């Protein structure tokens, strides 16, 4: 397939032409997670003929047998999930390094067109439809993924969760005329302030945890940006299931006088929104934040996701 794919791309892209003043953005079918040789071969053979190269990465325990329940899991399972989720950064970094070798000007975009959690389908549903529930654990997969994606936007130009409605880690679940918004939906909503904004690099120092399969995860994840109106937004996740985290941020040069925000959390990691209880997990105003001169102090409750706006 590594040698066959460039030939297929070359063949079909030749017949995909621009018409009526429109320009096609041609994306080659790229690798799944750790298949770095796929990226190397495509960039070597057709890198100058494409505009983008796709990549898939799922937070999944394996492709054979049970993938685990979406709503019934242990704390150990939760931490393993976050470790697997965060490994996407290493995957993105390695694919980007290969692309840089052939395309140092970054003309070819990396397009992460499938990502998210993949659990066993909900009991009683059609297995082929991949319908799964969505808990606070899935919300953390979304927030940690966003924090990582934000760091690589010089190459990563698209990151599509799979999918939006009723499939895998979706943002919306429907049943007949009923609709429910998932915890993942609310993370998307809380992070939309970073769209069309300028990324602000963060230096983050926090405790680390060793998790299953020889992975390590930081207890706090974060990202920040400045929007076109000059407002700074900071999103943070405290992944510690049991303990709050005190976060201190140096705001030197921002002239911020106050901060407002919202928080997404729940009593249990396994909590989710159902058609019977659609508002079980949703954001509420967040007030545990103080500014003293150039120092921002935030108390993040256990298992919480927060976005604040500096004013």
Segments (PLM) and residue ranges:
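Noncatalytic carbohydrate-binding groove/subsite architecture in carbohydrate-active enzymes
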Residues: 2-146, 206-216
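Conserved, mostly hydrophobic/aromatic
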Residues: 12, 53, 95, 114, ...
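Generic recognition of flexible, low-complexity loop/linker segments
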Residues: 41-42, 97-101, 145-149, 176, ...
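Aromatic/acidic polysaccharide-binding cleft in carbohydrate-active enzymes
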Residues: 57, 108-221, 228
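Carbohydrate-binding surface patches
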Residues: 217-255, 261, 306-307
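Acidic, Ser/Thr/Pro-rich beta/coil linker or hinge segments at domain junctions
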Residues: 255-296, 300
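Short Pro-Gly-centered flexible turn/kink motifs
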Residues: 299-310
């Amino acid at each position: 397939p590594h040698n066959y794919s460039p030939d297929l791309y070359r063949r079909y892209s030749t017949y995909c032409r621009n018409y009526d003043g429109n320009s096609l953005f041609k994306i080659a079918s790229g690798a799944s997670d750790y298949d770095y040789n796929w990226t190397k071969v495509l960039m070597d053979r057709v890198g100058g003929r494409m505009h983008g190269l796709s990549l898939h990465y799922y937070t999944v325990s394996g492709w054979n047998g049970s993938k685990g329940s979406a709503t019934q899991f242990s704390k150990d399972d939760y931490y393993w999930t976050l470790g697997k989720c965060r490994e996407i950064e290493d995957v993105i970094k390695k694919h980007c390094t290969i692309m840089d070798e052939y395309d140092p000007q970054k003309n070819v975009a990396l397009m992460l067109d499938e990502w998210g959690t993949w659990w066993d389908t909900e009991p009683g549903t059609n297995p082929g439809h991949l319908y799964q529930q969505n808990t606070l654990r899935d919300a953390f997969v979304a927030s940690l993924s966003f924090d990582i994606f934000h760091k690589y936007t010089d190459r990563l130009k698209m990151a599509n969760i799979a999918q939006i409605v009723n499939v895998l880690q979706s943002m919306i679940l429907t049943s007949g005329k009923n609709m429910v918004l998932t915890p993942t939906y609310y993370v998307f909503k809380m992070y939309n302030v970073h769209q069309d904004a300028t990324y602000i690099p963060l230096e983050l120092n926090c405790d680390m945890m060793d998790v299953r399969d020889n992975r390590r995860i930081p207890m706090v994840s974060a990202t920040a940006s400045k929007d076109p109106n000059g407002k700074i937004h900071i999103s943070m996740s405290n992944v510690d299931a049991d303990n709050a985290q005190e976060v201190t941020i140096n705001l030197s040069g921002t002239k911020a006088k106050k901060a407002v925000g919202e928080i997404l959390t729940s009593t249990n990691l396994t909590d989710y929104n159902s058609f019977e209880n659609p508002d079980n997990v949703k954001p509420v105003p967040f007030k545990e934040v103080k500014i003293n001169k150039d120092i921002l102090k935030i108390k993040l409750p256990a298992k919480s996701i927060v976005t604040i706006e500096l004013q």
